[in-house]
Amino acid sequence: MTNMSWSFLTRLLEEIHNHSTFVGKVWLTVLVVFRIVLTAVGGEAIYSDEQAKFTCNTRQPGCDNVCYDAFAPLSHVRFWVFQIVVISTPSVMYLGYAVHRLARASEQERRRALRRRPGPRRAPRAHLPPPHAGWPEPADLGEEEPMLGLGEEEEEEETGAAEGAGEEAEEAGAEEACTKAVGADGKAAGTPGPTGQHDGRRRIQREGLMRVYVAQLVARAAFEVAFLVGQYLLYGFEVRPFFPCSRQPCPHVVDCFVSRPTEKTVFLLVMYVVSCLCLLLNLCEMAHLGLGSAQDAVRGRRGPPASAPAPAPRPPPCAFPAAAAGLACPPDYSLVVRAAERARAHDQNLANLALQALRDGAAAGDRDRDSSPCVGLPAASRGPPRAGAPASRTGSATSAGTVGEQGRPGTHERPGAKPRAGSEKGSASSRDGKTTVWI
């Protein structure tokens, strides 16, 4: 008994702590601290010499052993050890059932998670036809889209990597989903939260362990009552200083003396109190479960609480103003182009703007000529030409690209210069008083 180890039973009881209510955790604390520790530390030290120092006033061989057997049919310490083991047996059986039940639920949830796995890799996106018949394909323009192709390759690589990682972490995800589904939710399993506070009762109900839990509570309470009655019948409420014995082979009634009777009496009363406290905790836990179930039933009959009013619908996103008609892009136009092609597109836009300005200037010149009193005069006698209009009949052509060049430092117009050959060109000249525009 001096080398008795309680580690195995303590580990089992600590595991029960994870599947019990708040009152059950208090009962477990009382059992471990006041019963196991007191019995292992105090009881062993107090009752270690109970038989060695139990002496009788006779020299008859065997009389001392017979009288001690009559005084204590079962040693106090061994009785309390047996009591702890028997009372802990229902809890250990409940723990075994709970672990088995949760393991089966975990396996079922893992299989469901495997069935809910996503399908195979999606097919590559088909090449979309041009939205309008008049718009050519990007290949017809001789333009490449390297960044778009790179993006597709990266997307495929990321998809493959994600699927590989998903296959590697398949079982871990299934176990995590099972833990969440089975009842590992802290807010619903006994931890205080903003929505409410409870002590594990709902978790036991959710795991389907309520009947087994109540059964082990009833068994524990019955064992407590039985051991209280047995302890009273065996030892009473005190350890008497001397014990009269008349059993054979004692020649007559002899008096036997017990060592440290007061200390043993105090310890015996402490064990009575601990047993009564454990019995009271069992009764309180059963009452707690009954009242909690009754409250849940009443709330279920009343119906769910009124839900909060639905939030107001969010306004639609702001509509941004559309781009100008002359600069609008097709819906599938890609802005991801190379730097040289961006410059080319910029020059093309400048040429289009210059051409539009020339057309507007020509139209304004025709209106002025029709309204001028000197209609028959030659063009040279009408004064200097307006800005943006051709200078003379045989003057040099004005390149449309010079509009962009005027904004560039260090560039000057040269009369007679030809348009650049890398972009679309537009110029205008005046022949016979008419304006001709070509691109």
From Swiss-Prot:
The keyword Membrane is annotated on this UniProt entry: yes
GO MF terms on file?
A: gap junction channel activity; gap junction channel activity involved in cell communication by electrical coupling
State the annotated membrane topology for this chain: Multi-pass membrane protein
Disordered, as annotated region: 108-178, 364-439
Annotated localization: Cell membrane; Cell junction, Gap junction
In terms of SMART domains, this protein maps to: CNX, Connexin_CCC
**Documented effect of changing R125Q:** Associated with lymphedema in a small family
Compositional bias, Acidic residues, is annotated for 140-174
Q: Name one GO cellular component term.
A: connexin complex
Q: Spell out the Gene3D superfamilies in the cross-references.
A: Gap junction channel protein cysteine-rich domain
Provide the free-text tissue specificity comment from this protein's UniProt record.
Answer: Expressed in central nervous system, in sciatic nerve and sural nerve. Also detected in skeletal muscles.
GO annotation (BP), single? response to toxic substance
Which stretches are transmembrane? 26-46, 79-99, 217-237, 266-286
Give residue spans on the Cytoplasmic membrane side.
Answer: 1-25, 100-216, 287-439
The record, for Pfam families, names: Connexin
Record's keyword terms, sorted: Cell junction, Cell membrane, Disease variant, Gap junction, Hereditary spastic paraplegia, Leukodystrophy, Membrane, Neurodegeneration, Phosphoprotein, Transmembrane, Transmembrane helix
Outcome reported for the amino acid change (mutating G149S): Associated with lymphedema in a small family
User: What clinical condition does the entry mention?
Assistant: Leukodystrophy, hypomyelinating, 2: An autosomal recessive hypomyelinating leukodystrophy with symptoms of Pelizaeus-Merzbacher disease. Clinically characterized by nystagmus, impaired motor development, ataxia, choreoathetotic movements, dysarthria, and progressive spasticity. Spastic paraplegia 44, autosomal recessive: A form of spastic paraplegia, a neurodegenerative disorder characterized by a slow, gradual, progressive weakness and spasticity of the lower limbs. Rate of progression and the severity of symptoms are quite variable. Initial symptoms may include difficulty with balance, weakness and stiffness in the legs, muscle spasms, and dragging the toes when walking. In some forms of the disorder, bladder symptoms (such as incontinence) may appear, or the weakness and stiffness may spread to other parts of the body.
Query: Subunit composition?
Result: A connexon is composed of a hexamer of connexins. Interacts with TJP1.
Q: Which family does it belong to?
A: Belongs to the connexin family. Gamma-type subfamily.
Q: What is this protein called?
A: Gap junction gamma-2 protein
Gene that this sequence comes from: GJC2
